[in-house]
Amino acid sequence: MQKKNFYKILILFVIFFFQQNSFASIFEGIPRVVDGDSLEINDNKIRLFGIDAPEKKQICKKPYLIISFLSFQKKYECGLLATNQLKKLINNKTVKCISESKDRYNRYLSICYLKNKDINSWLVKNGYAVAYKRYSKKYILEEQHAKKNKLGIWQGTFQNPEEW
């Protein structure tokens, strides 16, 4: 009889534990843009899931003069550009972020939306971030689009943000 009760309690505990961890956290509000892939809404630190933007102080290169087979490149602050483009996109509007987990820095890993627009997708598709393939395959097509069309960081050379 005690063994039966033990298993019932164990099963209830397991069900309760997994239910607690399966619900998504939803954050809604006007965010503070921390950098090209991080936001803060009401003191909740949010990391945009599945993407990696250049770091704030990261420098990239883009062509400024092409003569026949020669290409001259100039440096630019691609990390600051990614941050500013995210600020410009959000433009003090309400954002909704849906998170199912946290990263090692205790930030919510989230897909964020401006109305119905996936912000994470927009950043990758326009070349302000790369698909973070180590953690997700979700934004690979958007990255291929940006690369093919030489948008954002794909117009020149850059060090992958993960390696910077």
Question: Model features per residue range: what roles?
Answer:
Residues 2-164:
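Small beta-barrel nucleic-acid-binding modules, primarily SNase/OB-fold domains
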